[in-house]
Amino acid sequence: MSSHPRPSPRRIRRFGAASIALGVLGTAAQAIGNIQKIQTFVTDVIGSKAFKNLHLALTAVVVAALILAYAAATYWIYLKLQSRDIRIRIAVMALALVLLSGLAVGSYALIPPPPDPDAYRAEKAKEWRDRLLAHPAEDGGVKVSFSEAQAPTQVWTTAQALRAVLVSSVDADLKRLAARLRSAFDFIEDSQIRAAPGGWGYFKEWQTGVTEIAGWVCVAEAASVDATRRDIVWAPEQVSRIFDRITHVVQLIVSTQQHDGGWGPTAQRGADLSRTYSTTLATWCLIEAHRTGGTPLIPDSTYDRAITDGITWLLTNYRQSLGWVPNPHRKIQNERFLGLTAQVLYVLEQAQTSEHFKSVATGPNALPAKKEFLAAPDFGSRSLGDNDRLHDSDRYLRIVSPPVSTPASCTCPPFTIEASTFLWYPWSLAAVRSLAFDQTIEATQRAAAENLSRALTGRLSEASELIDTGFNYIVAEFLIGVSENRPPNASRDRGKT
């Protein structure tokens, strides 16, 4: 008999119940922590960095709770067997130790890993895809805002949403959303300006075509006929019609290129009318359309000349220490447009994946631009809502009458450009994810791009406040940014239909 007084049966029962409760609590805590939706919710509420710290603290608490619980359970079993034969006690205690040790090891193994930024990114991408197409308007278009019931539909927003949904979706999503996607494309087709030279205005009733809107329409249509998607989005008999639409947009874009190689916001041609955003979207359109291989009416020579001239204009108008600015013709400037610079670099990276345009995309100013961008000091501290807007003086197009002997490209009324906001976060994320695979830069710079990609992805939870303003263009551009994931040594050249 033991020399120690044996606790009362009631005390032993209470001790056993407490041990079991503690073990259940620890196990429940780890099970709950392993649910991705709960992790996503917590990340939304407190942010990725705070959640990582919380995870470390909770892991320590859970481990301590499990150790105490299983130690207490072992001691409880010992107390219950205190009066039994020594051989029985030894056998039962040995079995209990084996079982409890196994449970302890298993429980430790089940402790959830730290929050995964890529898993969170995938969750947000799905949420944003569904949000963009959740409430289609009667005309099939996407409204400028998801928070205002009376918000108008807009081709610009619709095209951005289509591109975003298409490049971010897996097959199951595309099948589920295919009908809505087709309806949105029909809205774009029905909203064209019928008078020459055509195109799309800021809203349906606006009769001046805008280059960047045509560019977005083009990259959306090109995404829909990508070889991995076309059979899901379109019926076989519809595919040729979509290629005809792409051909029409390409012809429009090519016909409105300025003599200096850039593009202006409208079809009007004239000195100093080229703008960076217009040129970026027009060049991107041509790159994506060329890649589809489904526009035989547009010869390679036309693509080569237009894209080469567009890229050359962009690289020529890069400004050291500033990057790209919306209107390079304004002489004295000291404002950095990080979002615009990131988007230009992203488009140059797309050009670089094609053997047709690799040499021009890596021409003068390309490497300095990439190096300066990767060295930008404010990626970690800049608020996601701290975005640059077009300067007031850059919104007004100066109308210059062409010489009598020079045919005008269109009869264009005075025009005011929309005061666009250039979102820095999504395009910076897209750019660094591409730069991480760029073989034209040094290995240390690729590593820096990879580190920036992880750091920016870790800040994705900060997007909620900006997303919740309700503007669908923000949702679309963020969705494009988080969906860029170019494989190593990607070489995407002209495909086959």
What residue ranges belong to the model's regions?
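Hydrophobic, helix-forming membrane-interacting segments
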Residues: S2-Q82, R89-L110
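Ser/Thr/Pro/Gly-rich low-complexity linker/stalk segments immediately outside membranes or between
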Residues: F41-V45, Y108-D130, A134
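An alpha-helical repeat/solenoid feature that recognizes helix-turn-helix modules
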Residues: L95-V98, P112-A119, S145-L177, R194-D244, ...
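Buried hydrophobic core positions in alpha-solenoid tandem helical repeats
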Residues: W128-L132, A184, I188-E189, V250-V254, ...
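Alpha-helical repeat scaffolds
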Residues: D304, P364-P377, A449, S453
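Short, solvent-exposed mixed-charge patches
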Residues: R494-T497
